[in-house]
Amino acid sequence: MTATILMIAMTLSTILAILSFWLPQMTPDMEKLSPYECGFDPLGSMRLPFSMRFFLIAILFLLFDLEIALLLPFPWAAQLNTPSIVILWAALILTLLTLGLIYEWLQGGLEWAE
């Protein structure tokens, strides 16, 4: 029974795949080949200039978002037999992120306009 259903499904999908190549009109013209973007002609550069400052701020946001993800399990981990290890790891993570933030601040990465 399942072999019959499998053969019917494979045959039907093969027929539909072959028909999808034969049915479309094969006469491309300029209108069909040009992209349509909300009624505007897509002339000019497709890429907009990207601010490097914005990229740095986005990376910093991701780092501090990762900090939240790393520190979230610590209240539950503090109930372990050795909470001093948990506090040590939390302090280490916060120290590294704080040093990184101070470094970015001193390098001028957080200043939006110069």
From Swiss-Prot:
The alphabetical list of record keywords is: Electron transport, Membrane, Mitochondrion, NAD, Respiratory chain, Translocase, Transmembrane, Transmembrane helix, Transport, Ubiquinone
Q: Where in the cell is it found?
A: Mitochondrion membrane
Q: Using the UniProt record, give the first listed, main subcellular location.
A: mitochondrion
Could you tell me the membrane topology recorded for this protein?
A: Multi-pass membrane protein
Q: Which domain of life is it from?
A: Eukaryota
Q: Which residues cross the membrane?
A: 3-23, 54-74, 85-105
Cysteine pairs forming cystine bridges in this chain are: none
Enzyme category, top tier: translocase
Named from the GO MF annotations, one term is: NADH dehydrogenase (ubiquinone) activity
Q: Name one GO cellular component term.
A: mitochondrial membrane
Q: Which InterPro entries match?
A: NADH_UbQ/plastoQ_OxRdtase_su3 (IPR000440), NDAH_ubi_oxred_su3_sf (IPR038430)
Report the catalytic activity: a ubiquinone + NADH + 5 H(+)(in) = a ubiquinol + NAD(+) + 4 H(+)(out)
Pfam families from the entry?
Answer: Oxidored_q4 (PF00507)
Enzyme Commission numbers on file: 7.1.1.2
Please report which protein family the annotation says this sequence is part of: Belongs to the complex I subunit 3 family.
Explain the purpose of this protein: Core subunit of the mitochondrial membrane respiratory chain NADH dehydrogenase (Complex I) that is believed to belong to the minimal assembly required for catalysis. Complex I functions in the transfer of electrons from NADH to the respiratory chain. The immediate electron acceptor for the enzyme is believed to be ubiquinone.
Supply the PANTHER family for this chain: NADH-UBIQUINONE OXIDOREDUCTASE CHAIN 3
Q: What is this protein called?
A: NADH-ubiquinone oxidoreductase chain 3
What's the name of its gene?
mt-nd3
